[in-house]
């Protein structure tokens, strides 16, 4: 570590602690572990702090809270309903809508990712890629990115969300809709 780092109290230990916190957060997300919230919150409040600015970590913690709330609703077969008149939704029910970009597209268009009862669809840019749930092999989430992989393909569509909450909740809803389509369900009860 350099002289400036030592003078201003920056140590490699802070970087290690921040990395360890993010790994703990990722495990809590994967396990849907509500009990981990208190420990993650306490770790953010330690002195010295994990980082000079904890805004991203606080956003990640809030995203985990939102995901846990959503998972309770999904377990009870309650999907969120989003009122929209967007033409790409058509007669489908819309269960998620978030601003996204497509970082792998050369034009890097921005628009909205809409998760409907029958498909994931991007509204923005010059084209409107859509992936029907029955043709979706996998939904992956990493940081603020969502990747929808089509059945029979090695590639997919990557969407970059503006927040961790949108990425986590969008992935959870997409997986729920994908599983429902595989079971042959066209609509999940909205009670």
Predicted segment positions?
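Acidic, Ser/Thr- and proline-rich intrinsically disordered linker/docking segments
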Residues: 3-11, 88, 125-191
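Anionic N-terminal interaction surfaces
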Residues: 2-110
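Conserved beta-hairpin
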Residues: 104-125
């Amino acid at each position: 570590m350099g002289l400036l780092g030592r003078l201003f109290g920056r140590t490699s230990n802070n970087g290690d602690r921040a990395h360890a916190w993010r790994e703990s957060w990722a495990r809590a997300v994967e396990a849907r572990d509500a009990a981990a919230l208190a420990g993650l919150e306490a770790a953010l409040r330690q002195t010295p702090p994990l980082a000079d600015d904890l805004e991203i970590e606080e956003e990640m913690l809030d995203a985990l809270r939102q995901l846990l709330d959503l998972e309770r609703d999904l377990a009870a077969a309650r999907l969120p309903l989003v009122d929209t008149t967007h033409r790409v939704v058509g007669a489908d029910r819309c269960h998620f809508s978030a601003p996204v970009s497509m970082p792998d597209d050369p034009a890097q268009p921005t628009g909205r990712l809409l998760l409907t009862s029958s498909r994931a669809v991007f509204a923005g840019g010059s084209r409107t890629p859509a992936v029907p749930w029955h043709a979706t092999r996998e939904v992956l989430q990493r940081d603020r990115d969502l990747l929808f992989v089509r059945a029979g393909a090695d590639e997919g569509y990557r969407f970059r969300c503006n927040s961790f909450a949108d990425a986590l909740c969008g992935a959870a809803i997409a997986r729920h809709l994908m599983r429902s389509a595989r079971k042959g369900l066209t609509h999940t009860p909205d009670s």
